[in-house]
Amino acid sequence: MNLLIMGLPGAGKGTQAAKIVETFELIHISTGDMFRAAMANQTEMGVLAKSYIDKGDLVPDEVTNGIVKERLAQADIKEKGFLLDGYPRTIEQAHALDETLKALGLTLDGVINIEVDPASLIDRLSGRIINKKTGETFHKIFNPPVGDYKEEDFYQREDDKPETVKRRLDVNIAQGEPIIKHYRQAGIVRDIDGNKDISEVFADIKKVIENLK
């Protein structure tokens, strides 16, 4: 079983990916882990990626695609199957993944697409506040500070401000839509309502994956 998980930042993709991997005993392939392993093992693509990172440059698509190909070519992939997380990020990377899978004799069985209302994601992602004195982190909705606090006792990181979060989501939506469309045309997308609580979302995902078998 070879799967891809997609969802906007804050949609709970990381939490659900961990549950999928544990339940179905798949290999979790996340972009960050792949890069770290390739660089640590000094693979051809890992050495190349490090040369860009050390200079502070963006790693080009062909190097990222090469790192993915190196990982998918390893023996454990055919034995166990995989869950791709964080790749592809662009439609060009999706086309490159198609070519890689074809070259390796692998198929993508399903794309788990966690859908969450962007407005609620902005609330989720922009709710983080930090106590100016203690540095403690709270969330306006999910973990509000208890006690005699005033609003001016807290500050918000630039990254967490609603307008910044909205811009980030807009970029993710613009990049993600063509990828979802590409996989819809292949008939392998399974939409999951991510507005429910974590256990309900996973129950829906589990059902979908079991039906793919």
From Swiss-Prot:
Keyword Nucleotide-binding: yes
Binding site for ATP: G10, A11, G12, K13, G14, T15, R128, T137, F138, K196
Function: Catalyzes the reversible transfer of the terminal phosphate group between ATP and AMP. Plays an important role in cellular energy homeostasis and in adenine nucleotide metabolism.
Listed EC numbers: 2.7.4.3
Transmembrane segments: none
Residues noted as binding AMP in the record, renumbered to the chain: T31, R36, D57, L58, V59, G86, Y87, P88, R89, Q93, R157, R168
Lineage of producing organism: Bacteria, Bacillati, Bacillota, Bacilli, Lactobacillales
Family: Belongs to the adenylate kinase family.
Record protein name field: Adenylate kinase
Region (NMP): 30-59
Record keyword Nucleotide-binding present: yes
Pfam families: ADK
Subunit (UniProt): Monomer.
Catalytic reactions of this protein: AMP + ATP = 2 ADP
Superkingdom of origin: Bacteria
Locations listed in the record: Cytoplasm
Domain comment as written in the entry: Consists of three domains, a large central CORE domain and two small peripheral domains, NMPbind and LID, which undergo movements during catalysis. The LID domain closes over the site of phosphoryl transfer upon ATP binding. Assembling and dissambling the active center during each catalytic cycle provides an effective means to prevent ATP hydrolysis.
Broad enzyme group: transferase
GO BP annotations listed: AMP salvage
PANTHER family listed in its UniProt record: NUCLEOTIDE KINASE (PTHR23359)
GO MF, one annotated term: adenylate kinase activity
